Amino acid sequence: MKFTRREFMKAQAAASAAAVAGIALPATASNLIASQDLTKIKWEKAPCRFCGTGCSVLVGTQHGRVVATQGDPESPVNKGLNCVKGYFLSKIMYGKDRLTTPLLRMTEGVYDKNGQFEPVSWDAAFDIMADKFKDALKKKGPTAVGMFGSGQWTLWEGYAASKLMKAGFRTNNLDPNARHCMASAVGGFMRTFGIDEPMGCYDDLENADVFVLWGSNMAEMHPILWSRLADRRLSNPDVSVHVLSTYTHRSFELADNGMIFTPQSDLAILNFIANYIIQNDAVDKDFIEKHTNFRKGVTDIGYGLRPTDPLQKAAENPDSGASSPITFEEFAEYVSEFDVDYAVKMSGVPAEKLIELAKVYADPAKKVVSYWTMGFNQHTRGVWANNLMYNVHLLTGKISKPGSGPFSLTGQPSACGTAREVGTFSHRLPADLVVANPKHRAIAEKLWKLPEGTIEPKPGYHAVLQNRMLKDSKLNAYWVMCNNNVQAGANINEEIIPGYRNPENFIVVSDPYPTVTAQMGDLILPTAMWVEKEGAYGNAERRTQFWHQQVKAPEGAKSDLWQLVEFSKRFKIEEVWTEDLIAKMPEVRGETLFDVLYKNGQVDAFGLDEVADERLNDEARDFGFYIQKGLFEEYASFGRGHGHDLAPFDQYHEARGLRWPVVNGKETLWRFREGYDPYVEKGSEVQFYGHPDKKAVIFALPYEPPAESPDQEYDLWLSTGRVLEHWHSGSMTRRVPELYKAFPDAVVFMHPDDATARGVRRGDEIVLASRRGELTSRVETRGRNRPPRGLVFMPWFDAKQLVNKITLDATDPLSKQTDYKKCAVKITKKV
């Protein structure tokens, strides 16, 4: 057997990566050492299907199946390394219960909301689905139809969905599951900088002197980035790591300064740091004078609950993001009350640890990167937390340069690309445009070749509101794609399941597997997965990555893109648009939504001659044109020249991703900084060009308590989250035998003293209950997650233990993002 040098290097890289990750390469994921000529395995690149890190993998296919995956040595993100989930990617598409035909609830051959699922053809599925959507539109108008999408959609799936809903059905009732994970990050960016997404990149990991983790367990949730951080820390004795969390987890193993704080008190800690910087004359005065403004935000803004909820009714300024200008001196006075004594009182963190943390931010010689994920974003004041984090970096000028900056890490593979950049939120359009702005609507209508007034100006129902409107019978035809919200959404007993089973509603769920959500629906559509279709994701560092279709989906399964576009053929313009709108563009009369949205001379501009004969591309060949390229190029036209520039389509198939803005073929590593960002004018040093005056905003915002806290009856905090072995609801990872065996069932992590006080011990069955529901689980008092007294942690991957029966559907009133990290529970021993 002969090896080329390239093949040998790949084998070495794979072996080294596995050793670092602490696992042996499984046989199904370790084919490099076999000659490709003998095994006939074909290798191609694709971004990983799981988290927002955006690792690149090499996918090995043979006889029409994915048989192996390995880390891509040419990837600048993961450099050949994969986490344990990535090593088993080859198995996620081959679960025994993979769906291959549409399933409709029926009794005696007729649709019945209370019937059993029975197979139907795609035509029959689309027939009844179209009837239900048309009926809802006719009876109640566009607000009666909606869609819940995903940060796991490809770019063109999200873009096609946005056009179908916002331009076709003329409803803004489209929201992604990224509402649950990244909406507060979006709100924070837009308030402070006027433009979304991080200014830094992963290169900061090799440049920083100090890493601070806020509500982020990178060791398990972003393990490849953690490996790069660990390498930097362990090879440089002067580098330090600070970790803040409400419980101890694996990231604390590397922490030089670990801090456990009382839930919600991160707001007080951040204001303390700002005060410390000012009191110790560590403010970069030249920077803030040139590049920032100061504003004071309104307070007492509520908790995103139903308007009838007593907490919401009591709010003085419910849902308000208003603010007013103040001076630096007024800001300094505002944060002066947040001294170390106050921060200690609120957080429970010892003073010396807080001061040690504040000193690294204040030290002008230290380059600091702050990372956060769901601990900040899933927070009833998540936007504020993001704003306060930016305050610290702006006050010190530690921003938008190598090794210094705030960095919001992303949870899903394309929450940045598809949810945020494409604009699949209920209030957004591509490239940071919003539906409420008439100029923005006009831009979209022009690019989409639509008559003026097509796009509705009022934001649609966001994720949590969609559930409430389903329950209240105001949203009646509903399509769920690429997510598992009945398992993932908060307060499912009271606010989600009733809406799905409401007899007035028709629920469609597109999924590869019979998830909890699929089983609650009325029609299930079998979906193609990952490399069974051509796709593109955008990761947390603004890196856009493409992949080709590499295998065919099981017969009968169709991609989300195919479903969206094919479904559009069922609607004549007269069935969805008003007569006055059609009168503005009479030539569309008699045409279908497919004709107007996807065969508009732009989306269908690239022919099948651009798809190589040897390439699989089921959607392009079904529709007769290179639809992915057409959708991408039309979408990219929104951002080019406006700070969101994307490279030409074909370039991404060659590259290992490019970080936007991409101008003149060059990607941007650090935004807003002269010399790195092409949009920053020469001689200006820094320009936060999202705002008209090109300045960022430093906000004066207070500490405010959570929506629910422990009391005498419900005496414990509950925090939910993930574990290394499983991703989100586990609908893919729990079908991989090796990952399932590694962590088969969810458990409730709790402090041993709390367990003893309740008469339970490790392994005992317990009942975990809140005011909203209860479940049975088992106690874990050891292991990777070690809560302090008074708090328990439970992961949500286990469909047998739906922890979101217990959680509260309170949200950040500005971002509408759910707070999964704080509610009150009690634990009793199961008898």
Swiss-Prot record:
Catalytic EC class: oxidoreductase
Reactions performed catalytically: 2 Fe(II)-[cytochrome] + nitrate + 2 H(+) = 2 Fe(III)-[cytochrome] + nitrite + H2O
Record-annotated membrane-spanning stretches: none
Signal peptide: 1-29
Family recorded in the similarity comment: Belongs to the prokaryotic molybdopterin-containing oxidoreductase family. NasA/NapA/NarB subfamily.
Name of the protein: Periplasmic nitrate reductase
Record-annotated 4Fe-4S Mo/W bis-MGD-type domain positions: 41-97
Single GO MF descriptor: 4 iron, 4 sulfur cluster binding
Chain positions recorded as substrate binding sites: W796
Known EC number: 1.9.6.1
GO biological process: cellular respiration; Mo-molybdopterin cofactor biosynthetic process; nitrate assimilation
Alphabetically ordered keywords of this record: 4Fe-4S, Electron transport, Iron, Iron-sulfur, Metal-binding, Molybdenum, Nitrate assimilation, Oxidoreductase, Periplasm, Signal, Transport
Organism: Psychromonas ingrahamii (strain DSM 17664 / CCUG 51855 / 37)
Binding site for Mo-bis(molybdopterin guanine dinucleotide): 85, 152, 177, 181, 214-221, 245-249, 264-266, 374, 378, 484, 510-511, 533, 560, 720-729, 804, 821
Function: Catalytic subunit of the periplasmic nitrate reductase complex NapAB. Receives electrons from NapB and catalyzes the reduction of nitrate to nitrite.
